[in-house]
Swiss-Prot record:
GO terms for molecular function: RNA binding; tRNA pseudouridine(38-40) synthase activity. The lineage of its organism: Bacteria, Bacillati, Bacillota, Bacilli, Bacillales. This is tRNA pseudouridine synthase A. It holds the Pfam family PseudoU_synth_1. The active site is at 51 (nucleophile). Gene3D superfamilies: Pseudouridine synthase I, catalytic domain, C-terminal subdomain (3.30.70.660), Pseudouridine synthase I, catalytic domain, N-terminal subdomain (3.30.70.580). It comes from Staphylococcus saprophyticus subsp. saprophyticus (strain ATCC 15305 / DSM 20229 / NCIMB 8711 / NCTC 7292 / S-41).
């Protein structure tokens, strides 16, 4: 039986999702619980492997089990054993050929930034502090250039190991908030550090150090050295996982060009 789990977590005190030899991770927390319940190792498979310090409002993983436990009991058992910075929102049974990673057709991230005269220690780990006044209109102009299908080689970590760096973004915009602004970006998939590089560049645009019209040339150049910035992990939230094309159509309309994954290229 294949079990699908919807979770949220506050990532400040985790070394990321993926299990590490030493240190606290999301995968380690769940596999420890599942091993105790099954009396043997159980591997979980996430929709996204978030990095150290990154949060998730919505994240999914699946695992296989021989235990005959109702969905609500799975949720209750895991929440009872989990620490306070992780929560299981929902548990459901899925077909045995469903795969959390390869059936995922889209992801949405939100990067939160606050602006004030002084740093707020109570927001440490939850939002990124930018003291300068920024030109939100110019940032939005630049953000729009990222929408569509592009090679994002120049906007990801040089450690990115996947062969194809072509991704499709359905949404890329700045949203003003009471304390600052958020960057919302939705796409078929994202490269290593891609969202953090995108927002770091947009902040430079907001400061007047870069221009919106540079984006097409930078995408064409595919040179990471021309965009040598990466924003901190603390402001980044995995906000939504799209597991079906209908979910994307509901949010972005019938004309959206949906990329079916079923491969390791669109991480």
């Amino acid at each position: 039986m294949r079990v699908l789990v919807n979770i949220s977590y506050q990532g400040s005190q985790f070394l990321g999702f993926q299990i590490q030899q030493h240190g606290r991770t999301i995968q380690q927390q769940f596999e420890k619980i599942l091993k105790r319940m099954h009396k043997h190792e159980v591997r979980i498979h996430p929709s996204s492997r978030t990095d150290r310090g990154v949060h998730a409002i919505e994240q999914y993983f699946h695992f296989d089990t021989e235990l005959n436990i109702p969905e609500q009991q799975w949720q209750y058992a895991m929440n009872r054993a989990l620490p306070d910075d992780i929560y299981v929102n929902d548990v459901s049974f899925v077909n045995d050929d469903f795969h959390c990673r390869y059936d995922c057709v889209g992801k949405s991230y939100r990067y939160k930034i606050y602006q004030s005269a002084h740093k707020d220690p109570f927001l440490c780990g939850l939002k990124t502090y930018v003291p300068e006044q920024l030109d939100i209109e110019k940032m939005n102009m630049a953000a729009q250039h990222f929408i569509g299908t592009h090679d994002f080689t120049g906007f990801c970590s040089q450690k990115t190991e996947v062969e194809s760096k072509i991704r499709t973004l359905y949404e890329s915009r700045i949203e003003k908030t009471e304390s600052g602004f958020d960057y919302i970006v939705t796409g078929s998939g994202f490269l290593y550090n891609m969202v953090r590089v995108l927002i770091a560049f947009l902040i430079e645009v907001g400061k007047g150090k870069r221009e919106p019209q540079e984006v097409p040339q930078l995408l064409e150049a595919r040179d990471r050295n021309q965009v040598p910035f990466t924003a901190p992990a603390e402001g980044l939230y995995l906000e939504k996982i799209y597991l079906t094309p209908n979910e994307l159509i509901q949010d972005f309309g019938n004309n959206i060009k949906i990329h079916q994954k079923k491969s390791s290229q669109n991480l």
